[in-house]
Amino acid sequence: MATIHVDGKEYEVNGADNLLEACLSLGLDIPYFCWHPALGSVGACRQCAVKQYQNAEDTRGRLVMSCMTPASDGTFISIDDEEAKQFRESVVEWLMTNHPHDCPVCEEGGNCHLQDMTVMTGHSFRRYRFTKRTHRNQDLGPFISHEMNRCIACYRCVRYYKDYADGTDLGVYGAHDNVYFGRPEDGTLESEFSGNLVEICPTGVFTDKTHSERYNRKWDMQFAPSICQQCSIGCNISPGERYGELRRIENRYNGTVNHYFLCDRGRFGYGYVNLKDRPRQPVQRRGDDFITLNAEQAMQGAADILRQSKKVIGIGSPRASVESNFALRELVGEENFYTGIAHGEQERLQLALKVLREGGIYTPALREIESYDAVLVLGEDVTQTGARVALAVRQAVKGKAREMAAAQKVADWQIAAILNIGQRAKHPLFVTNVDDTRLDDIAAWTYRAPVEDQARLGFAIAHALDNSAPAVDGIEPELQSKIDVIVQALAGAKKPLIISGTNTGSAEVIQAAANVAKALKGRGADVGITMIARSVNSMGLGIMGGGSLEEALTELETGRADAVVVLENDLHRHASATRVNAALAKAPLVMVVDHQRTAIMENAHLVLSAASFAESDGTVINNEGRAQRFFQVYDPAYYDSQTVMLESWRWLHSLHSTLLSREVDWTQLDHVIDAVVAKIPELAGIKDAAPDATFRIRGQKLAREPHRYSGRTAMRANISVHEPRQPQDIDTMFTFSMEGNNQPTAHRSQVPFAWAPGWNSPQAWNKFQDEVGGKLRFGDPGVRLFETSENSLDYFTSVPARFQPQDGKWRIAPYYHLFGSDELSQRAPVFQSRMPQPYIKLNPADAAKLGVNAGTRVSFSYDGNMVTLPVEISEGLTAGQVGLPMGMSGIAPVLAGAHLEDLKEAQQ
């Protein structure tokens, strides 16, 4: 710690910080542009000037840039010194000489750091009367709009994109006061994390193009704390709504999880919530048509049918909340509850859970991954299946340069010096996969092989680290030399990290990862293990347990069950569509509860219109076992009284109560959570994931809307001049109103949107943190359900045999895509242009045998249908395998590991 003196007052601060960080952490306001907590200091903008004095007697002082000055013990500075204030105002005026005066039409208006800093410095009058330099804007793809004339040359964008996210297609061109930030030519930004430019940029150069089409000012949107639903990582988000539509998603700061950044799937993949074809009312089949029901009719009709059924089974979902899956389990009984995922996937999920719960290896939170100094990724294409983890791995690899700089006593915020000292030095990263991955550019070595051979590599590494681990026979000398390099790197690391997951299609790969981690722990290393699952609540569903989807289908096929309730699950993604359709056709009652129109609704007798994550409350559990709560952003019925969309748990409990002819006793979310905790002790922690509905701050609920929210009385005037009462939230501590507490200093961790007096942009998160870039002042939201076990598992011993290609037979290797493989985000219209066209990948040798080239269309039969796809050639894919894009164009993820036998060139 260090003692500094600011404008005559004494403060205790972190001596490792610079003065800007220290003052912002104290709650003092210093304007800045080029500095960012995640990017460090470069002193490019000169906006953060303060007056520094030699001692208490010095009255003259000198101007220094606070972001480039350490917060040393005994420092004396003044923020309010007149010369410093005039200098800061002059800097803004210089920046404004070329900045357009277009705030009223700029999409950043009201959410703009430049506006905030201009007001903070007191600059309010323009004296420049000459020609402004102008630029041509670029088309940067479907996600981001580009308006270069607003640029103030702070260099944040290229520092984030190139130095932090390792992007290669955005740069700075020109010199002096005529520099251009963009691509060499028009085109879509290639980085999976390009959307963060929207919040990194302090002006309106980079803005959210998906928001542009249905634009609202930040102060006119309703927000709620939420969790990204597009993968298993559980990033925190702030969805914004207006007129019953999601308009944008912003990053919600969580110092333990995603801190300042999201991936593009999480930021832009919300379009499925706004689709017009979503089920909005319950419907029941009458012959070939569906008739619309109200809620009471739906419940009574369903109950009447279920009473006549001899056995009702329930099929849950990894994309439904803990509460909804539990409500289904209560409706049908624990013995009749099925997870809705394939047997193989469920087996891998349970194995991953076993490793996390009983393996005795620490599971780091997302942000902690950045602190590891050697990483082994076994089998998982992390950028496509858990992209935010990939960004964290990139920071872990860069830790080598920080170590080198620290050895020379260079502060952590001196980023230019760190990059200069490091000269691209990296901590070791080793990646195995069936083919190339997006992490290969920073990897020390990559191994492209079938999953069996990847598992064998992992087992061999574990044995080399600890000879009591099972040995692997038949390792080639060349591969053994690589294993020796990996072993040396992992054994020499202080904090090695092993990453694997369930998307590999191989339980043996997960076992190999666990063995490596156990062997490293036995050597005294502070080892961590990260498992990536498939869906937002896969871990929660795994903890809850239940039979596999195949078992559920067998119940229907044999007639043992004659009614089925399917919860938020497109079963065609988890099993053969032919088998699913045949099994559902045998059931006299098929009830579907979902917020998306899926293929299985064609077999449904009753459809209950569920609410999406934006219209409901619930709990999900991420890949590290962290329970996190998402909150309802808006009530769709407020805009359309004909809409009947309820949380799935509310539908199912209401049906259960109707079936038993009793009163509904789960009238709010807390009641469901209490029931979950009572029945499933391992989920007891979900009660602490967020405060209950009685939580108040000074007697007030928390506001979902900024206090400047406008137009509420006129929003429905086109429907009726009579303004209805605002929706009443009985489930949570939030209110659908601007009336309520929204103070940044209030004792809360669940923050709907970032705002503080004088801070309207995302930089306002500074005001909510215990120290800038640290944790939220009153703790990061969420709670870990299981900590590191004191015990450890025995070594897994089932070393697989080496993969052997078979003539006339090809094994399907899974290829995942950030844009396209996820069930929900692939429905977003804006994603269509980013999704690759369906393909089949072949090794050159296999392509030669078949007599096909790149672009040739080949066909194969699957599930009774003939599939025709264009060929792509890949040198990395091992012969005897074909690669298919999982989750796209009818290519169900369950296909991973299956075999094709009739692959041939398609008839023209």
UniProtKB/Swiss-Prot annotation:
Specify the domain of life of the species encoding this protein. Answer: Bacteria
- Cited CDD domains: fer2, MopB_CT_NDH-1_NuoG2-N7, MopB_NDH-1_NuoG2-N7
Provide the cofactor list for this protein. [2Fe-2S] cluster; [4Fe-4S] cluster
GO BP annotations of the record are: ATP synthesis coupled electron transport
Q: Which reaction does it catalyse?
A: a quinone + NADH + 5 H(+)(in) = a quinol + NAD(+) + 4 H(+)(out)
One cellular component term from this protein's GO annotations in UniProt: membrane
Residues that, per the record, bind [4Fe-4S] cluster 2:
C151, C154, C157, C201
Positions of the 4Fe-4S His(Cys)3-ligated-type domain: 83-122
UniProt keywords, alphabetically: 2Fe-2S, 4Fe-4S, Iron, Iron-sulfur, Metal-binding, NAD, Quinone, Translocase, Ubiquinone
- Boundaries of every 4Fe-4S Mo/W bis-MGD-type domain copy: 221-277
Residues bound to [4Fe-4S] cluster 3: C228, C231, C235, C263
User: What does the annotation say about its assembly with partners?
Assistant: Composed of 13 different subunits. Subunits NuoCD, E, F, and G constitute the peripheral sector of the complex.
Please give the name of this protein.
NADH-quinone oxidoreductase subunit G
Species, as recorded = Escherichia coli O6:H1 (strain CFT073 / ATCC 700928 / UPEC)
Q: List the lineage, top down.
A: Bacteria, Pseudomonadati, Pseudomonadota, Gammaproteobacteria, Enterobacterales
**Name of the gene encoding the protein in the UniProt record:** nuoG
